[in-house]
UniProtKB/Swiss-Prot annotation:
Residue stretches making up the Cytochrome b561 domain: 15-220
Record note on quaternary structure: Homodimer.
Binding site for Fe(3+): H108
Segments on the Extracellular face: 33-47, 106-118, 180-197
Protein's name according to its UniProt entry: Plasma membrane ascorbate-dependent reductase CYBRD1
Binding site for heme b 2: R70, K79, H86, H159, K225
Lineage: Eukaryota, Metazoa, Chordata, Craniata, Vertebrata
Residues engaged in binding heme b 1: H50, H115, M116, Y117, S118, H120, E180
Positions of modified residues (Phosphothreonine): T285
Length: 286
């Protein structure tokens, strides 16, 4: 099936990948050039893993996971395969985010810095916990086969909304963290005097913001939604489409065949009962 507005989609996709990749490169340059590199010794070099892993996993990889269903080259792949890829990318993002938080706690423990005192830390830890919860719920309800279709229809709009909300909150949290870090480390020259590190890192923040905007635009265009698989029917609640943005939750064709077989069986039984009654009536009149 051809995608409507394919050239526009391709242009935005390439732009998103380019900007996201540049964001990862910029955060690496920031910590390697301006912040003395990476390490795992409880010092500042260990803390530097925090922005690197947060931008790479929680921003870039999560953004790709959000739009993976919309890649038209994957529409011939099974829905289960795409669900597995979506879940796998989100799992990688969660693991990298967890490691980034561990690096911060180690750094604070070694330096005797209080934990969880800033708004950045409050929002960041909250969104990480909710992200892991979202991943676990999605795994058990959408990836594993035993959840009833009615439950999937109820949860899907919540899953889509909360996923986008968490992604937007992650971007806001990263921008808060970048600004907070610059205020802490830029003393001479100070942040407000436009030092090279400040200008460079502000550019990183703009790249992250643009990447998020491109992902939001791609995932909210209805004409770029993955089409339903042949032989499937959408589940609807109260007359509404229950699938949110990424295609209707569908009953498989095997289920449809089972339902059809059951209907034919019931019709056959009804015909037999009718013939039996007719036969009985004929016998009573003979």
């Amino acid at each position: 099936m051809a995608m409507e507005g394919y050239r526009g989609f391709l242009g935005l996709l390439v732009s998103a990948l380019l900007v996201g990749f540049l964001s990862v490169i910029f955060v690496l340059i920031w910590v390697l050039h301006f912040r003395e590199g990476l390490g795992w010794d409880g010092g500042a070099l260990e803390f530097n893993w925090h922005p690197v892993l947060a931008v790479t996993g929680f921003v870039f990889i999560q953004g790709i996971a959000i739009i993976v269903y919309r890649l038209p080259w994957t529409w011939k792949c099974s829905k289960f395969l795409m669900k597995s890829i979506h879940a796998g990318l989100n799992a990688v993002a969660a693991i990298l985010a967890i490691i980034s938080v561990v690096a911060v706690f180690d750094y604070h423990n070694v330096r005797k810095i209080p934990h969880m005192y800033s708004l950045h830390s409050w929002v960041g830890l909250t969104v990480l916990i909710l992200y892991i919860q979202q991943l676990v719920v999605g795994f058990f309800i959408f990836l594993l086969p035993w959840a009833p279709p009615s439950l999937r229809a109820i949860v899907m709009p919540i899953h889509v909304y909360s996923g986008l909300l968490l992604f937007g909150t992650v971007i806001a949290t990263v921008l808060m963290g970048v600004t907070e870090k610059l205020f802490f480390v830029l003393k001479n020259p100070s942040y407000h005097s436009f030092p090279p590190e400040g200008v460079f890192t502000n550019t990183l923040g703009l790249l992250i913001l643009v990447f998020g905007a491109l992902i939001f635009w791609i995932v909210t265009r209805p004409q770029w939604k993955r089409p339903r698989e042949p032989g499937s029917i959408p589940l609807q609640l109260n007359g509404g489409n229950a699938d949110g943005m990424e295609g209707a939750i569908a009953i498989s064709s095997a289920h449809n065949m089972d339902a059809a077989d059951a209907e034919l069986s019931s019709e056959g039984a009804a015909r037999k009962r009718t013939l039996g009654l007719v036969d009985t009536g004929q016998r009573s009149t003979m």
